[in-house]
Every structure is written in C-alpha cells, then in structure tokens.
C-alpha cells in the first residue's frame, strides 16, 4: 500500500476566446516546438474558415466532428501464450475524445493542400458531415474490434 496520496486528475483549461476545454485540448495537440500562439492562430483561423463555409456556429461543427470521430471501442495488443492478440477494450469518454482529436489532426496533416488552416477546417467540416479520413479511421477501429471479438475474454 502506498504512503503517498493519490494524484488528482488534471482538468483541461478553457481557451480565451471560446471558453471551451475541447478547443484548448485541440490547441495543445496542434502545438509544435512550444509555439502555442501559432497553434491558437491556426485554430482560430480554421474556425473562421468553417464559419464562412458552413454559415453555422464553428464550435457546434467542432463538437459534431469530435462526436462523430470518437470511438466507443478500440483494440489493444495482448501477449497470450506466445502469440499476440488484438483484444477489444471499451474506451472512456476522455480517452475517446483524445483519440478523436489525434485522428482529426493526423488526417488534416495528411491532406494535400496549401496550409494547416485550410486542411484543418476542411477535415472538421468533413468529419461533421460524416466523411473524411478521421471517420474512416474510427470505422476501421470498430471493424478491427468486431473481428477480434473472440479475444474479448483476455482483458
């Protein structure tokens, strides 16, 4: 038994403009080489572009995109008796959102295009509509979990 106290789970802070934790989580994942102001700039410009494209609230588009990409279940490699099995596991909401953000940014970085603002806004709009690489990644993960359902008892 540990003599130390249990660590408190840190909650994400909200960003200055939208006052939203999800936006701050996204900014922290866009961040490269400690340039947070540039990450904020990229996201806010992408939100403006979404506003122009869809003529709706960009925050609701972001929420819809993340909700659409968030997986319910994932696979984890487990070594059992000399062979490695892909074991399906359920994912909590926080971990699911983190995965969704990672997939959205990965898909937007892979997109061909001019700059990150354009690519990110396009990927978010596509994900909100139910298409795009990030949605495909989620469906692929769900398919993988369904295929390996027989190994669910290895948890």
UniProtKB/Swiss-Prot annotation:
Whether Transcription counts among this entry's keywords is: no
Protein's GO biological process: ribosomal small subunit assembly; translation
- Highest taxon of source: Eukaryota
Keyword Membrane belongs to the record = no
Compartments reported by the entry? Plastid, Chloroplast
- Which Pfam families does the annotation name? Ribosomal_S7
Q: Where are the transmembrane segments?
A: none
Which PROSITE patterns did the record assign? RIBOSOMAL_S7
Cellular component annotations (GO), alphabetically ordered: chloroplast; ribosome; small ribosomal subunit
- Which keywords, in A-to-Z order, does the entry hold? Chloroplast, Plastid, Ribonucleoprotein, Ribosomal protein, RNA-binding, rRNA-binding
The UniProt entry, under InterPro entries, shows: Ribosomal_uS7, Ribosomal_uS7_bac/org-type, Ribosomal_uS7_CS, Ribosomal_uS7_dom, Ribosomal_uS7_dom_sf
Question: CDD domains, alphabetically?
Answer: uS7_Chloroplast (cd14871)
Quaternary structure and interacting proteins, as annotated: Part of the 30S ribosomal subunit.
Q: Which NCBIfam families match?
A: rpsG_bact
Q: Which family does it belong to?
A: Belongs to the universal ribosomal protein uS7 family.
Q: What does this protein do?
A: One of the primary rRNA binding proteins, it binds directly to 16S rRNA where it nucleates assembly of the head domain of the 30S subunit.
Put simply, this protein is called Small ribosomal subunit protein uS7cz/uS7cy
Q: Give the organism the record lists.
A: Populus trichocarpa (Western balsam poplar)
- Which taxonomic lineage does the organism of this UniProt entry have? Eukaryota, Viridiplantae, Streptophyta, Embryophyta, Tracheophyta
Q: Which gene encodes it?
A: rps7-A
